[in-house]
Amino acid sequence: MSVRITDIWRAFQGLVPSIIATADGRGMPNVTYVSQVYLVDERHVALSCQFFNKTRRNLDDNPVACAEVVDPLTLQAYRLRLKFLRSEKSGPLFDTMSLRIDAIASQTGMTGIFRLIAADVFEVVSAEMVQGFLTDPPPDVRSGISLDGARTEMRGLQLVSERINRANDLESLLACVLQALEEFFAFSHTSVLLWDEQNRRVTTMASRGYGESGVGAEVALGDGVIGTVARERRLIRLTSLEADLRYGRAIRRESAAGERALEAEIPLPGLKDAQSMLAIPLTVGDRLVGVIAAEDRDPMRFSEWHEAYLEIIANQIALGIDRMIERGDEAADAGVPADTVPLPATSAAGSRMIEACRSKRRLTYYRNDDAIFVDDEYLIRNIPARILWKVLGEQQRTGRTEFSNREMRVDSSLGLPPVKDNFESRLILLRHRLQQKCPDLQIVSTGRGRFALRADAAIELVER
């Protein structure tokens, strides 16, 4: 029975390995597995040309092939009769296929080795269901999204948009977005990472489903799936994630036997057993703001429909973040002047008595590493570390506990970039890290463009 290849889109997600059969000019067949047959449009598919030298030589001699793809939900097989048209080494199709492979390569330490050589494009001469392959599929398996489901998700989109618009600050904006994605769309493992231009990294500012440990995690530009999305500023959707990583690691082991040095593998952020992932860049114009990522243990959790849907949400999030950055700049300018120093709340003698009754925490700043450790455990580094060290030192010298964003911005010792900088995001990161590692020490917002240092322990400062 003939089928339209766009109706069997699940079979092209790469969850079940596909089979490709070719023959050389003398008719000698060659059959091999391929990780994925890429659905181009209703009449064309593409194969990634990476290591299949025999397949490629056969196509040059005899430009016909037969592929078998399998629906991962029904396990129904479909046979495609193909005619080889061309091999593309650049262009939109090549870039799209290459992006996925590059992300997997980076995730497994195979950058530059595990890569796309070309995208081989085929015309689909015919597509048919393999008769007798299975019994009838389960009746509850659906090929698409119902109208009611689409209406529900459109209502969810409206509610997410409302929450973004109502957010009063960056921290509440990020938290409410991730909460809404779980409430309305059951995306239970999500994170938002913001771009740090100075350090060329994206930093996790909010997460849901991972616990507190995810906040503060950094990903360098081009590292792993998230780093690749940030570098290319293009969406990546991965299904059968574990199979892709396993394949990349297998190639890595073969390459490691040679003389070529390989970089260390980067642990996949989030779920260790994630089977699907969707990562979308947050951009305003051509400027990178960050990345939003979602993961799931269901290998078919995200579809092309989710890509389009989350891109709409990502655009709104990016604009919302940009609005908060602008508001933060205004708040910094409106903050108290740098020479305004509130008096300590207690006398020096009273402070010493309070200190004697409190627990003690030792914070060590390692200047060469630009990092702070609390009781020999890593706390934070870079600009947030310098901010914390600045206010801690000021508090110990003068007893001062309240500060303004403006004075931090104009303090050259902190090394803030001269261009527009999301200072508020650095305070959010610092606040979360203190909550995780040193709850006796808090950074508290005290008004627009102002914050305070609150200490419930005696603080010892050590600089090395």
Describe each PLM feature range.
Residues 329-389, 441-444, 448-452, 456-464:
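Short boundary/linker motifs that mark transitions into or out of structured domains
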Residues 377-411, 430:
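Short amphipathic alpha-helical recognition elements used for nucleic-acid or partner binding
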Residues 205, 212-270:
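Regulatory sensory and allosteric helical modules in signal-transduction proteins
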Residues 213, 272-275, 289, 295-312, ...:
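Regulatory loop-to-helix N-cap segments in sensory/regulatory domains
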Residues 27, 135-171, 323:
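Signal-transmission linkers at sensory-effector interfaces
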Residues 266, 275-283:
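Short hydrophobic beta-strand micro-motif common in sensory/regulatory domains
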Residues 380-388, 416-437:
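DNA-recognition element of transcription regulators
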Residues 167-205, 324:
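Helix-loop-beta substructure at the N-terminus of cytosolic sensory domains
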